[in-house]
Structures are given as structure tokens and as C-alpha cells.
Amino acid sequence: MSVAIIGAGAFGTALAVSLATKGPVTLWGRDTEWADTGENPRLPGVPLPPALRVTDRLDEITAETVLLALPAQVLGGFLAEHGAQFDRRNLVSCAKGIDLATLTGPSALIAAACPQATVAVLTGPSFAADIARGLPTALTLACADAGAAEALQRQLSTATLRLYRTTDVTGAELGGALKNIIAIAAGAAIGAGYGDSARASVVTRGFAEMLRLATALGARPETLPGLSGLGDLVLTCTSEQSRNFRYGLALGSRRPFAAGTTVEGASTARAVTQLAERLGIEMPISNLVAGLAEGRIAMEHALDFLLNRPLKEE
């Protein structure tokens, strides 16, 4: 089966570079003037392989399997405009977030726009630069259809990109979305000078929040401790390669953050506060991140916000 990627950002390009080691790949982006230079400025230092073709024409995306590497808050609009032409294909979401307009994950957006498509999710602990440079990386491929999951696992795995499969789409998708919120909180703890012990507490209690909400929304409990949940959480809470962690650092140290940079965790936190209220679930770290991102809570009050909560069993 042929493969194409929608979204020529760093992650979409990295996946295209990796998959091009197995055969021809088409990468679509709105702005592709850089293609003639042989390198995407969003992924500097990584040459585009000969098997990778870059285009800005959606009618040239004819592959049977299409990876949607678009930000979570952009995906819905793209599907509303173009989804019909991608129905009846294998559509793999690479977004990590919750759509603010519908309070649903990317897979639900795809299923609604393309009801005849086979919908899957690709998620897990990874940085674009690592994938593009051929460094060993393991991800989760989730699809409700076990047979399709196995076929996509074989198709999208490469010599350095190892995919594990699951049929728990909800769990895999929520793990990738929710960990971004906790990464912001972990970054804020470090940026504010609270130290590594505080970060460890944020990560651990944050994972408990992830598990509470995900299982309430139908995820299997055993999915979250895997690559798509705990694995991604550990990576993004400990590395400045993570935009969400860097955003938290900026919040904690009261420094400006690069304008125009996509920070999925900030939008996801806003969505999660609404979901948690609807379900009656306590999500204090997520509420804090939403408050910090929206300016409702000042960083100097963040510690009190968490530590002054009632004492309880772990």
C-alpha cells in the first residue's frame, strides 16, 4: 500500500523521511517553497530523501494510507473542507490533543468526516529530529479493527521506527493528549525553581489525573502505563525538546514564549477542564495549567493552588 502524509511540519516531515526508507512517500503542505532546497526549515539538518515527493496539491494525495500530521485544533477545519476526498482510505491521526469545539479526540473528528475510512492513531514518545535521523524510536499504533491494526503496523514500521499495536484507540489517543498538560506543569515547576522533587510529584500526580480521566472516557487502564501514556509523559516532562515543557519553563520563569509556536497542551487543558467538570472528576494539575495559560492564575500563586488542597490518601 502507498503512503502519504498531510502536514509538512517537523513531525510530518520526520515521518515522511523515515517511511521513505521503505518506498515512495508523498508529503503535502500548504507552503512548500522550501522543497527545492532539499531541506525543510522546520527540520533543519535533515536532507529530503529521493523517495520523498513534496507537494502543495491535495489532488496528488492518492495513497491508500494517509497520515494526518496536523495540529489538533487545525484538524477539524481541514476535515470539514477536505474530508470527503479521503473517505474509504486508511486515515492515521498523528495529532495529540482534544478538539476544543467538540471536546473529542482527533479519531472522532476523522470518523465523523470520513465514515467509510479505517481510522487509526499513531502516538507515543518521540521527537521529530530523532525519527528523521533514524534514531531508535518506539510508538503505538491504535486501531479498533485488529486486522487493520496489524496491517498498518507492518506498513508503517521501519528499521528504526518500531510500532506496537493496540485496539484501544481511546486510551492511546488520550495518553498522547493529556501528557502535554502535565509536561507544561512540569516545565513550570522547573522554571519557577521548585526543583526536581517538585517535578517528580507533578509527573506522578499528573499521571494519576491522566488515568482517572482516560478510564472515565472508556480507555482500558492497562493502556496508559504503556508507550502512548507513561512513555510519552516521561519523555516530554524531562526534555527541553518538548514544546510543551519549554512553554511551561517560560510560564514558570515568567519569560515570553516564541510567538506562533503550537502548544497543544494549553488548548487541551482548556478542553479537559470542561470534560472533568462534566464528569465530576478532580483534575487539579490540569485546572492549574488552564488557569496559567489563560492568565487566570498567576505563577506566584501556583504552589498555593496545589499545596492548599485538602490532604488525602494517595
UniProtKB/Swiss-Prot annotation:
The keyword Oxidoreductase applies. InterPro entries: 6-PGluconate_DH-like_C_sf (IPR008927), 6PGD_dom2 (IPR013328), G3P_DH_NAD-dep (IPR006168), G3P_DH_NAD-dep_C (IPR006109), G3P_DH_NAD-dep_N (IPR011128), NAD(P)-bd_dom_sf (IPR036291). Signal peptide: none annotated. It catalyses: sn-glycerol 3-phosphate + NAD(+) = dihydroxyacetone phosphate + NADH + H(+); sn-glycerol 3-phosphate + NADP(+) = dihydroxyacetone phosphate + NADPH + H(+). It holds the Pfam family NAD_Gly3P_dh_N. Its EC number is 1.1.1.94. It is an enzyme of class 1 (oxidoreductase). One of its GO terms (biological process) is carbohydrate metabolic process. One of its GO terms (cellular component) is cytosol. The keyword Lipid metabolism applies. One of its GO terms (molecular function) is NAD binding. SUPFAM superfamilies: 6-phosphogluconate dehydrogenase C-terminal domain-like, NAD(P)-binding Rossmann-fold domains. NADPH binds at F11, R30, K96, A128, R243, E264. Sn-glycerol 3-phosphate binds at K96, G124, S126, K179, D232, S242, R243, N244. It is found in: Cytoplasm. Belongs to the NAD-dependent glycerol-3-phosphate dehydrogenase family. This is Glycerol-3-phosphate dehydrogenase [NAD(P)+]. The gene is gpsA.
